[in-house]
Amino acid sequence: MLFRSYAYLPAYKEQGLAEGLDTRQIVVTGNPIVDVIDHYFRSGKIRLSSQSRRELFRRLNVGDQNQPFALMTCHRRENVENPTSLRRVMNLVRACGYQVVFPASYRTQRSLSEFGITPPSNLLLTDPIGYVEFLELLDGCAYVLTDSGTVVEEAAVLGTPSVQMRLSTERPEVYEWGASIKFDPTI
C-alpha cells in the first residue's frame, strides 16, 4: 500500500521531509479554500445577487453609507467554555470601534447567557447564517475577529484583514503574509 501525504504549500512538504517522509509520498495540492473562493465565489457561481446582498446588509444594518463594520466568529472550546476568555473576547469587541456582526453558534449564545456576559452595544448577535451569506459579509467587512483557522484563510484570500483570537493556529503563514494579527484571550 502506498502512503500519500497531501500538503497545501511547498513549506508543508518541507516539513514532511524533515519528519522523514519520502519526497515521492508528498503531493503539494494547493489550498482548496483558494479554489472554492476563486472558482465558486469570485466567479459568481455561489454569490448572492446584488439585490440579495443589499437585503442581507440592510437586514443586519451594516454597510450603509460606507460605514465600515467588522465580522466575528467565536466557537472554540477554549474561548466559548471559559468565562474569562469569553469576557476578554467581548472586551475586544467593545474596544474595536466598529459595529461587529456576530453570527453566533447556539453553544456560544448559551455560554454568554450562562456566564451572565452582556454583549457590548456595538455587537450585533445573530443566529448562524449560511456559507454564502457569511462569505458576502467577510468580503464586505473592514476586518474579521475569529478563532477559526478556516475563516483566517478565507479572509486572507479575499483580502480582508483578520484578528486571530487564539493562542496558536494551524495556518501560521497568515502572519508571515501580514494578513492577520494575534489576540490571545486566554492570557
What spans do the regions from the language model cover?
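A donor-sugar binding/catalytic signature common to diverse glycosyltransferases
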Residues: S5, L137-V174
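Short, glycine/polar-rich helix-capping loops at beta-to-alpha or helix-loop-helix junctions
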Residues: A11-Q15, S111-S113, M165-E173
